[in-house]
Amino acid sequence: AGTGLSSHELNQPGTYKPAKDTSVVTLFKVKPDHASEFLFNDAFGDVFIAAWTTTPWTLPSNCALTVGPKLDYVRVKTFNPYTHEPQTMVVAKSRLGAYFNEKNQDASLEDYKKDGKNVPWKVDGEFFGHQLEGIRYEQLFPYAQPEGGDAFKVIGGDFVTTEDGTGVVHTAPSFGADDMRVARQHGIGTLTLVDLQGRFTKEMGEFAGKYVKNEYYPAGQAPEKSVDVELSIKLKEMGRAFKVE
């Protein structure tokens, strides 16, 4: 893996298809302020915006969350399936069926047994994507800070769909053409925590020097757990994962 990997190569469709990708619905913790006030009104626990990704290794380089300005979103009161903590989360209305069991809708939040089964949930508020724009959230992994612009806020983008995921796109400008375009439009900075060999940079703490994909290791040297899996476990422990597959 001595050859340089351009972000173009890293983003080629099918580059990673031989291995089973780990996907995660990540929870980004909303900061309370004037813009987010309506999300905190009668909230249940902390408030999160949920974003799905099949490239967890790009999450430390997250700089923004992109929503569809005209898409319908809802606020859901529920529990984290891993930590069992109460939480309020934002997802696209049309994606509720992908993440919540219909039979548990409007079940009693007070009677939840905290066993990860039959997690109750309740829709409590509906709004358009453009109403979320400008809301700020806590940095997920504060290994390093973005450069060259603003960061950690919700922006609007025309490429967001509800065909899969949560209707919210985790946006890492260094690792995607759409991400870079929409970030520039909104004055969002960049954060690149992967070197040209495909390894995490020294800022990445316990992950520094690890290849972002096990396929990049020399034959026989790949660890049992890829960094995607390690990051997903860390997110579960932090209470920042809603679904890992």
Enumerate the predicted regions with their spans.
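Active-site cores that bind ATP or allylic diphosphates and position pyrophosphate for catalysis
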Residues: 1-50, 57-59
